[in-house]
Curated annotation (Swiss-Prot):
This is Large ribosomal subunit protein eL28. Component of the ribosome, a large ribonucleoprotein complex responsible for the synthesis of proteins in the cell. The small ribosomal subunit (SSU) binds messenger RNAs (mRNAs) and translates the encoded message by selecting cognate aminoacyl-transfer RNA (tRNA) molecules. The large subunit (LSU) contains the ribosomal catalytic site termed the peptidyl transferase center (PTC), which catalyzes the formation of peptide bonds, thereby polymerizing the amino acids delivered by tRNAs into a polypeptide chain. Keywords: Cytoplasm, Phosphoprotein, Ribonucleoprotein, Ribosomal protein. It is found in: Cytoplasm.
Length: 134
């Protein structure tokens, strides 16, 4: 017996392990899930209630790691639940094209392509060496 994604979201939206509430900023809620590409606490981005979810994280020296959820049959096997693809030391445009290809053109989650590319862009710009004033 499976439970619908909408019902799961109704249960976890106000209380889960990854939720970060900021009452001093008007009650805004963020999310620290590894497969939440935007960091917003919204059903569209949540990896807990969607069968297909995308995450973009920094790779240690340079580059990004693209995390996607695999088949929902692996829900009881945490080691097989996520697929991690390392996109390392490529130019920015190649990285963006690779992310767009793996998420959008394959039909995985077309709605998360722009958000994923923006997240990768922010990560890559933070990894660039800082310019020094001579």
């Amino acid at each position: 017996m499976s439970v619908s994604n909408d019902l799961i979201w109704q249960v976890i939206r106000d209380n889960n392990r990854f939720l970060v509430k900021r009452p001093e900023f008007g009650g805004i809620q963020f999310n620290r899930e590894p497969v939440n590409v935007s960091g917003k606490n919204a059903q569209r981005f949540s990896g807990l209630c969607n069968d297909k979810a995308v995450g973009v994280q920094a790779n240690s020296p340079r580059g990004v790691v693209l995390i996607t959820k695999t088949n929902p049959k692996n829900a009881q096997k945490p080691a097989k639940l996520f697929r991690k693809d390392v996109i390392a030391n490529a130019s920015s445009r190649k990285t963006y094209k690779s992310i767009a290809g793996r998420i959008g053109r394959t039909g995985y989650r077309d709605d998360l392509v722009k958000v994923s590319v923006a997240r990768a862009s922010a990560i890559l710009s933070s990894q660039r060496p800082k310019k020094t004033v001579a």
